[in-house]
Swiss-Prot record:
Catalytic activity reported: 4-CDP-2-C-methyl-D-erythritol + ATP = 4-CDP-2-C-methyl-D-erythritol 2-phosphate + ADP + H(+)
Top-level taxon in the UniProt lineage: Bacteria
Record keywords: ATP-binding, Isoprene biosynthesis, Kinase, Nucleotide-binding, Transferase
The UniProt record lists the keyword Coiled coil: no
Stated family: Belongs to the GHMP kinase family. IspE subfamily.
Name under which the protein is recorded: 4-diphosphocytidyl-2-C-methyl-D-erythritol kinase
Chain sites annotated for binding ATP: 97-107
The protein's role, per its UniProt record: Catalyzes the phosphorylation of the position 2 hydroxy group of 4-diphosphocytidyl-2C-methyl-D-erythritol.
Listed Gene3D superfamilies: 3.30.230.10, GHMP kinase, C-terminal domain
Organism of provenance: Synechococcus sp. (strain WH7803)
Amino acid sequence: MTAPVCVTAPAKINLHLEVLGLRADGFHELAMVMQSIDLQDQLHCENTSDGSISLRCDASELSCGEDNLIVRAARLLRERSGFSELGARMHLKKHIPIGAGLAGGSSDGAAALVALNELWGLSLDASQLERFAAELGSDMPFCVAGGTQLCFGRGERLEPLPPLEAQLGILLVKDPDVSVSTPWAYSECRRQRGSTYLQDEAAFEARREALRAAQWLHPLGGEAPPLRNDLQTVVEPLTPSVRDALQCLASLPNCLQAAMSGSGPSCFALFHNRGEADRAKDQVQTQLDQLGLRSWSCSLIPHGVKLMA
C-alpha cells in the first residue's frame, strides 16, 4: 500500500481583479493576476482499506462533511478514476484564515486532488487535475498551478507569468470576526457598476491583451501597474474593518501599495522584501490589536500545491 502523502496548500492574493462584464452563462467575466504566498495549510492523506473517505481538521469551525471541498475533490477524483474501492483518511492543518478572500478552501480542495493523485497512483498530469479543479471552484485551477498567473474567464483560464523579479514581502491583515459573501460582492458590483461593463467577447479580449502587455514582472513601483480590485470599491465603503486595515497599511513606511484580496475582507501591503514586511508588522502590531485585526508577514512563492518531502 502506498505510503502516506502530505502536501502544502498555499493562500493566494490578487494583484489585480477586474470585473469586465457578464458572460452568457450569467457568471462575471474576470481578468486577474493571482499570486501564491507562503501562508499555507497542510493536508496529510493515507489510504484506507475499506474505501471510506474521511476528513478531520484542527479548526473546529470548519465543516469536515460532504460540503467540504477536500471531501468533494476526493469523491470527484475517485469517481473519475473508475476505481470505486479507493479510499483516504485525511487530516487538514489549517493556517489560512477562513472566509478571508485568500482561496483557502479552494487551495485545500486543490491539495486533495494533488495528494490523492499521488497516494492512489493515478499519474494524472497537472492539466487534468486543473480540469477537475475547475468543476469544483473558479479559483481551484490556479491553486493547483500557483505561482504568478493571469487568470481569465471565471478565473479558471490560466496564463502563467514568470515569477515576479523582486522578492517582495507582504503584510496581510484580517478581522477574524468579519467575512464577506462573494456572491453578494459580485451582485453589488453589478448593481453599482453594471452600466460600465464591457459588452462582448471582442471587448473582453482587447482588455486581456492590455493586461498581457502590462509590466507585471517589474518591482512594484515606477513601471508596475497599480494594484486594482473592483470588488474593493464595493466592499470597502460598507466594511469598517476593511477601511481601517487599508488606512493602516497605506500609512506604513516603505509600503509600496496596499489593496484588498479577492472579495475580502483580507487586505495586504507590499514591501520591497520580507524583512521590511516583518518590521512593519512589529511596528504596527499594537495598532492592529486595537483594531481587532490579525496579521501575518509572508513572501511570494512560485508554485501552488506542493508535495512535501
